[in-house]
């Protein structure tokens, strides 16, 4: 294939699947689930258990799709497990007070149902306990329940998942057992509404098969949006290793959020992002030595074998490994580590010293956590093991230094991300205590929700909750016939570049959009730059979008993803214009509004599309505890959760 053929969109390799552009497939169901990740699977299972006929549309392969498609090593917020010593209600109140702009309602639901969701997985075939007594007698183990805990062995809130690598196949088998119709390789491109009108009841979705290009129309009484959060808005480079370390699954582009926006759903926290991020400079996730997260509480030593001291949250030295997992320790390697390097007290490189760890901790880090964490089971645990790495003998280099410009592995300041995780949530759909969005018939779960921050258990719990509520709603309404004009308009939009010549590939289109976001909506923003950014995005729509070539269904999928990222970028800029104040918590800096976190701006900014205009509004940070809701988490949960029983201690 010549370079000129590639540039003009000709000369693609022969496509291995039958191509059926334009062919329509019409289906009808009670509950439609958009996205078959963790949230979507739990939603579909729970809706089916409530008697609903359920269809799942998944862009990838549900058996291993989503951010946790390859596994999970620890399961957080399990406050109702039999060995937990922490009070759920107090923890929820404390979390809501400490973490503004994190949706406390979602955190509470996660705390209430996290352990239930884990035991659900156990019931379906994922044995998460230490049933073979490999860790008998270890401080991390509760002898009665045989549960292994992580991070804090006193409160016992985080559970190590012995067979977490198998979580998606377990969920997939349960979907099939319940008769859920799973349509893999179907990417949702738009939502159906009553009469085809924006702001009306959502009655299903439209999409394409990413292998054949055929069109799907699914009519549903209730729709659950569980497609993941958007990524690749500021950083786009698929060719360099490590490019996805901060982006979750690079296939998560936010097409669900974009589809909901276009029919008038209310979004919030869209102005939030963080940076700089690794981009193409990152190390493979957890594939280097570390003292945190999956590697916690591993010893660190310098090149001469000198141990890096650990401290608690008050700065007191923790002498023993066991002290690091004590209640309220807040254990971390000394924050003085970089100064110690500069003073010559620590000699680079540093290493994660697995051989010096107590045997149970060493086996837990390498054989349990690394072996079940989705990002590491194959690329780290399997590959390193096959190469001869032995955790009983070998240390692993830990790239910790700020002596290099920007720090080891960091990208430029303009490289940002909106990916949720680590107790940090950003933009998405606004929901109420029923997981219902601002549009009738549309529910949301997982990272599709604004402020969702619970990681894997957050997805599982909001998914099972939304599944129950959507099934309830579906039982009370009739099906409506989709609007033919809305379907035809969507088909015209998605197929407009099929068969057309062009000189722009989808990668160039995506990279160009990301570059505009870096320049005009980076770490420091102003009204003039943001409005200039909107102009440039519109210019891309008018020019490069109409010059993009689509040679097969795969490129059609990527092209439509570019359109979704364009839409998400426009929403982000509009949200950034609406917040006329800076915020340290949001990592949001307006140079023309430099005051940091003024009280009058301590609120959620909301946006929706109405009559082709962006309409902004606001919600109190605790809107879920304000009228018309009750004033406590417990009262609201018990009034809305639609759960008859809860597994508890």
Please place each PLM-identified region on the residue numbering.
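Core beta-strand elements of the Rossmann-like FAD/NAD(P) dinucleotide-binding domain
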Residues: 26-29, 212-222, 438
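Mobile, glycine/GP-rich and aromatic-enriched active-site lid/loop segments adjacent to catalytic centers
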Residues: 4, 123-190, 195-201, 269-455, ...
């Amino acid at each position: 294939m010549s370079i000129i053929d590639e540039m003009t969109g000709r000369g693609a390799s022969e496509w291995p699947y039958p191509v059926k552009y334009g062919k329509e497939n019409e289906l009808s169901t009670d509950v439609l689930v958009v996205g078959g990740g963790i949230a979507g699977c739990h939603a579909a299972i729970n809706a089916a258990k409530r008697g609903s006929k359920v269809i799942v549309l998944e862009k990838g392969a549900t058996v291993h799709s989503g951010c946790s498609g390859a596994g999970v090593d620890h399961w957080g917020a399990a406050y109702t497990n039999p060995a937990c010593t922490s009070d759920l209600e107090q923890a929820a109140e404390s979390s809501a007070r400490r973490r503004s702009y994190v949706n406390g309602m979602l955190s509470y639901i996660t705390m209430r149902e996290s352990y239930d969701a884990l035991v659900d997985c156990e019931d379906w075939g994922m044995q998460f306990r230490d049933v073979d007594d490999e860790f008998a007698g270890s401080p991390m183990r509760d002898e009665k329940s045989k549960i292994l805990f992580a991070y804090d062995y006193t409160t016992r809130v985080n559970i190590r998942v012995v067979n977490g690598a198998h979580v998606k196949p377990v969920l997939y088998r349960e979907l099939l057992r319940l008769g859920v119709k799973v349509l893999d390789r179907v990417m949702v491109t738009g939502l159906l509404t009553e009469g085809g009108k924006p702001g009306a009841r959502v009655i299903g979705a439209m999409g394409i098969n990413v292998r054949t290009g055929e069109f799907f129309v699914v009519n549903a009484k209730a729709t659950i949006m569980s497609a993941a959060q958007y990524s690749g808005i500021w950083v786009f480079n698929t060719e360099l290793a490590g490019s996805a370390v901060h982006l979750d699954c690079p296939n998560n582009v936010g097409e669900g959020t974009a589809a909901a926006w276009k029919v008038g759903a209310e979004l919030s926290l869209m102005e939030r992002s963080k940076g700089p991020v690794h981009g193409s400079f990152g190390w493979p996730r957890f594939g280097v030595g570390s003292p945190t997260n999956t590697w916690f509480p591993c010893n660190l030593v310098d090149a001469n074998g000198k141990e890096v001291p650990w401290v608690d949250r008050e700065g007191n030295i923790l002498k023993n490994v066991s002290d690091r997992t004590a209640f309220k320790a807040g254990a971390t390697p000394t924050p003085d580590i970089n100064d110690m390097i500069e003073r010559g007290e620590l000699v680079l490189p540093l290493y994660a010293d697995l051989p010096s760890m107590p045997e149970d901790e060493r086996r837990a880090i390498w054989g349990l956590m690394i072996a079940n964490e989705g990002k590491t089971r194959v690329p780290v645990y399997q590959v390193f093991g096959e190469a001869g790495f032995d955790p009983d003998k070998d240390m692993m280099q830990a790239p910790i230094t700020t002596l290099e410009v920007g720090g080891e592995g960091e990208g430029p300041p303009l490289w940002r991300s909106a990916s949720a995780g680590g107790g940090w949530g950003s933009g998405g759909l606004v929901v109420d205590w029923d997981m219902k969005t601002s549009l009738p018939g549309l529910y949301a779960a997982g990272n599709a929700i604004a402020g969702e921050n619970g990681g894997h258990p957050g997805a599982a719990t909001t998914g099972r909750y939304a599944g129950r509520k959507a099934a309830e709603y579906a039982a009370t309404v009739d099906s409506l016939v989709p609007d033919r004009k809305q379907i035809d308009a969507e088909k015209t939009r998605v197929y407009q570049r099929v068969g057309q010549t062009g000189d722009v590939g989808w990668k160039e289109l995506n990279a160009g959009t990301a570059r505009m976001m870096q320049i005009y909506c980076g770490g420091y923003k102003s009204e003039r730059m943001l409005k200039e950014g909107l102009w440039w995005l519109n210019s891309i729509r008018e020019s490069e979008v109409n010059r993009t070539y689509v040679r097969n269904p795969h490129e059609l999928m990527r092209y439509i993803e570019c359109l979704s990222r364009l839409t998400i970028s426009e929403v982000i800029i509009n949200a950034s214009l609406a917040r006329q104040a800076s915020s340290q918590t949001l990592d949001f800096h307006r140079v023309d509004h430099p005051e940091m976190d003024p009280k009058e701006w301590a609120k959620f900014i909301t946006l929706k599309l109405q009559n082709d205009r962006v309409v902004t509004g606001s919600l109190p940070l605790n809107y879920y505890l304000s009228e018309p809701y009750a004033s406590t988490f417990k009262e609201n949960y018990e009034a809305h959760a639609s759960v008859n029983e809860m597994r508890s201690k």
